[in-house]
């Protein structure tokens, strides 16, 4: 699918996040996560957001006509950036068929000592047609990600970063959403 086809398919429609913590979760195995995706597909979703290559690949193979937002959460000691933090994860997510790759789009430092949003520019330089979703926490993050070439902005990290905790305590950050 090209960018316009992806946007046309998801515009105004529901994307279902099919994710489970790795530990002690009955939906953790990829087969179970695919069943969760099946329920969402029956309900009419336009696509899925899934974590880890094995889940992304199995769900995409089961539902090739649905849009797949692939992420890979990698936790590194001493580093707050964990959503698809480096090109290594991007390469794998591309290879297994992610239509959209979501990355941390904050201005926090990744495990390589670079601002997380800088990965967007690197992806776009190597793969200009790759649709990139930036998971942001603040309006400033959104601006930086748009300048870096992000195709989609998601408020995924609002309330989860030092820059956004105070706003989250007040409830939904409608200013950020707008």
What are these model-derived regions, one by one?
Residues 1-27:
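N-terminal amphipathic alpha-helix/helix-capping segment at the start of soluble metabolic enzymes
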Residues 11-16, 63-78, 124-137:
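Short beta-strand/loop segments at the ligand-binding rim of alpha/beta enzyme cores
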Residues 27-30, 49-69, 80-87, 105-123, ...:
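Active-site-adjacent beta->alpha loops and helix N-cap segments on the catalytic face
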Residues 31-38:
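Short catalytic helix/loop segments, enriched in acidic residues and glycine
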Residues 38-44, 123-129:
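Short, surface-exposed connector motifs at secondary-structure boundaries
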Residues 40, 59, 93, 145, ...:
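Conserved, mostly hydrophobic/aromatic
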């Amino acid at each position: 699918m090209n960018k316009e086809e992806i946007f046309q398919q998801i515009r105004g429609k529901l994307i279902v996040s099919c994710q489970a913590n790795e530990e002690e979760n009955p939906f953790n195995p990829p087969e179970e996560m695919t069943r969760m995706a099946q329920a969402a597909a029956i309900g009419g979703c336009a696509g899925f957001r899934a974590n880890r290559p094995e889940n992304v690949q199995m769900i995409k193979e089961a539902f090739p006509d649905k849009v797949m937002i692939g992420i890979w959460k990698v936790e590194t000691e001493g580093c707050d950036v964990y959503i698809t933090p480096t090109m290594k994860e991007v390469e794998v997510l591309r290879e297994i068929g992610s239509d959209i790759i979501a990355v941390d789009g904050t201005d926090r430092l990744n495990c390589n000592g670079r601002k997380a949003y800088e990965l967007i520019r690197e992806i776009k330089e190597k793969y200009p047609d790759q649709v990139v979703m930036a998971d942001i926490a603040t309006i400033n993050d959104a601006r930086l990600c748009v300048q870096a070439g992000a195709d989609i902005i998601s408020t995924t990290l609002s309330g989860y970063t030092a820059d956004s905790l105070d706003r989250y305590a007040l409830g939904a950050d409608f200013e950020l959403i707008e």
